[in-house]
UniProtKB/Swiss-Prot annotation:
It comes from Rickettsia conorii (strain ATCC VR-613 / Malish 7). This is Uncharacterized protein RC0057. It comes from the Bacteria.
Length: 91
């Protein structure tokens, strides 16, 4: 539907928006252990870890607060700049 309304790169834009929306949720560290068997029949335990984003340093926060005129901000597509503007206080 979005593509039919002349919105380009719909999947990329939705993925970026989804990532920003995550700032609204509380996140926890998660570890997943899986047992797998390789092609030779040898058993392995695979460890997957996701570390929750717990915030920015003061320097990083200032970078977001003072983003006007910064190259990293200016080169972003407009829709991403709007997301940064909306979530700056949450980031």
């Amino acid at each position: 539907m979005l593509g039919k309304n002349d919105i380009k790169n719909v999947h990329k834009k939705l993925n970026v928006a989804k990532d920003f929306q995550n700032f609204n949720d509380e996140h926890c560290n998660i570890v997943t252990l899986s047992k797998v068997i390789n092609d030779e029949g040898k058993k392995h335990i695979v460890v997957e870890a996701e570390v929750a984003f717990k915030g920015l340093t003061e320097e990083q926060k200032q970078e977001y607060q003072n983003r006007d005129g910064k190259n990293w901000y200016n080169v972003m597509p407009e829709c991403e700049r709007k997301l940064v503007d909306q979530y700056t206080d949450t980031i």
